[in-house]
């Protein structure tokens, strides 16, 4: 999960990317998508406390319908959350992890 201008996601199962899983475009709360409510504009307009609460709810929602083994949270706005907020399956990763992950996905497709 990448927290930045919006919310980016990539889902892997058994080490393989599940393509076209645009989770951030799915409805989330009050008629808004994950992308809208977790993006930078929402962080600025809603305030950090409400935005963090929405991030925690989003991670729980993703776990409810994906039942993930682990989730990596990165991006420019990941610095505003703590892994403690999400439990043992969550890891906060540096902003560069999203770029490196994208490169890795590109390599996997070859």
Describe each model-derived feature in a short phrase.
Residues 3, 11-110:
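ATP-binding/phosphotransfer module of carbohydrate and carboxylate kinases, centering on a glycine-rich
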């Amino acid at each position: 999960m990448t927290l930045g201008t919006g919310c980016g996601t990539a889902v892997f199962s058994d080490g393989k990317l599940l393509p076209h899983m645009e989770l951030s475009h799915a409805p989330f709360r009050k008629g808004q998508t994950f992308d809208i409510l977790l993006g930078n504009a929402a962080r600025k307009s809603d305030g950090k406390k409400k935005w963090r609460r929405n991030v925690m709810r989003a991670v729980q929602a993703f776990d409810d319908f994906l039942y993930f083994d682990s989730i990596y949270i990165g991006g420019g706005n990941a610095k505003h959350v703590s892994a403690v907020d999400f439990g043992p399956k969550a890891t906060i990763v540096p902003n560069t992890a999203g770029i490196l992950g994208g490169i890795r996905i590109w390599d996997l497709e070859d």
